């Protein structure tokens, strides 16, 4: 009788531990070499656009906490290349050449998968009475959410390609 209780207890304990252990789809989100901005993907994107509107500059080092390591490297390399000077002199983070007066980033709360590595978020931008929409791609580096790309959706696009990355990559 003593062994029968023990033989029932062990499988039940294993079954219970198997039911309560949840592993994320991606165990490692990589490392991050730069500083970090606190918040979820939509919060970090909103802080980025608020910072850009307030400071009105394309200083890559000041924007570094908001950008992925790869995008920051691409922008830094592009800033030394005369072929990309016009794009970087204007607003590379928007479809339009001039900075917006306001920006509203869509909520990421509607995204069902908490383990998502890439989260595209729509951004409603306005300058005066004109409004347009772009899309920002957020990724997770380590524990930080950062901007990895901007998709230009705003109609009169000043860039040479449909996304920021495509516009500054040397092909």
UniProtKB/Swiss-Prot annotation:
Lipid group attachment sites (S-diacylglycerol cysteine):
19
Please give, as recorded in its UniProt entry, the membrane topology of this protein: Lipid-anchor
Q: Which organism was this protein described from? A: Escherichia coli (strain K12)
Question: What protein name does the entry list?
Answer: Uncharacterized lipoprotein YbjP
State any GO CC term.
Answer: plasma membrane
Keyword check for Disulfide bond: no
Q: What range does the record give for the signal peptide?
A: 1-18
Q: Where is the lipid attached (N-palmitoyl cysteine)?
A: 19
Gene assigned in the entry: ybjP
Q: Report the subcellular localization.
A: Cell membrane
NCBIfam families the record matches: PRK10533.1
Question: Which Pfam families does the record match to this protein?
Answer: DUF3828
Tell me which UniProt keywords the record has, alphabetically: Cell membrane, Lipoprotein, Membrane, Palmitate, Signal
Q: Does the keyword Ligase apply?
A: no
């Amino acid at each position: 009788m003593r062994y029968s209780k023990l033989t029932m207890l062990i499988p039940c304990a294993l079954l219970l531990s198997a039911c309560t252990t949840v592993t994320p789809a991606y165990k490692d989100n990589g490392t991050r070499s730069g500083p970090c901005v606190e918040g979820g993907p939509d919060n970090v994107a909103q802080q980025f656009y608020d910072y850009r509107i307030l400071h009105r500059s394309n200083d890559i080092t000041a924007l570094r906490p908001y950008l992925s390591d790869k995008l920051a490297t691409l922008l830094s390399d592009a800033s030394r290349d005369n072929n990309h000077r016009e794009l970087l002199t204007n607003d590379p983070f928007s479809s339009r050449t001039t900075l917006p007066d306001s920006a509203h980033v869509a909520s990421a709360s509607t995204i069902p998968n908490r383990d998502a590595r890439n989260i595209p978020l729509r951004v409603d931008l306005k300058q005066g009475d004109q409004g347009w929409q772009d899309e920002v791609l957020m990724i997770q580096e380590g524990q930080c959410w950062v901007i990895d790309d901007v998709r230009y959706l705003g109609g009169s696009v000043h860039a040479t390609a449909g996304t920021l990355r495509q516009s500054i990559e040397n092909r």
